[in-house]
Amino acid sequence: SGPGHFTPTLENERPLNIYGFSKLAFDHHVRRRIAEGSLPITVVGLRYFNVYGPREAHKGRMASVIHHFSKQIVDTGKVQLFEGSGGYGNGEQRRDFVFVRDLAQLNLYFAQAGPWAPKAGEKRQTWQAVVNAGSGRSRSFNEVARALMQVHGNARIEYIPFPSDLDARYQHFTEADLTGLRETGCDLPATSLEDGVRETFAQTEPMLV
């Protein structure tokens, strides 16, 4: 759970919870089928990082942390971040936040055959890939709070104790290695955190409750 550990290769695949394990189990199933030569279709696995965007209120507690922080600021005038943990200072734990529109465009890219669409007269080829789908840049929770304040106005940051029982299951750092994605020929631009937050809450602030 540190820098350099987010390349989708076997030595780096150590899920921290059952949800991650279930995703990895399916990837292994597909990889085995590929190795056996029994999967004659194009399969692309996109490993999403921390997705956020407009219209998340209906998701309740499963909404993104950016949505929850925004609601805290609107409702209470403050945002609660964890104190230092995992070698990171107060609020300095980092995540790769990816704007939902970027992922929609990425899915469409591959759904439309991406780099593998056959040219006129060519036979369609089949390809397989498991790649990261993120922005490629980690940002701290302090930076998230500051980006939200640009939209909602100043708020107080309150640092709360990090739960000791969470340490072994918590990702203190995530950043997508996009090498595999770039190798497919996909070079779609990533929306910055600041621009994504601004667009998200310009549309949805009345629906935060």
For each of these PLM feature ranges, what is it?
Residues V74-V209:
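C-terminal substrate-binding subdomain of Rossmann-fold SDR/epimerase-dehydratase oxidoreductases
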Residues G4-T7, V51, P161, L178:
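Hydrophobic alpha-helical segments with strong N-terminal bias
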Residues G4, I18, H28-Y109, A147-M149:
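NAD(P)-dependent short-chain dehydrogenase/reductase
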Residues S1-I18:
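Conserved Rossmann-fold NAD(P)-dependent oxidoreductase catalytic core, especially the SDR/UDP-sugar
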Residues S22:
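Active-site helix of classical SDR
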Residues P8-E11, L46-N50, R124-Q125, A155-Y159:
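A short alpha-helix capping/helix-coil boundary motif
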Residues E11, G53-E56, C186:
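A broad detector of the eukaryotic-type serine/threonine protein kinase catalytic domain
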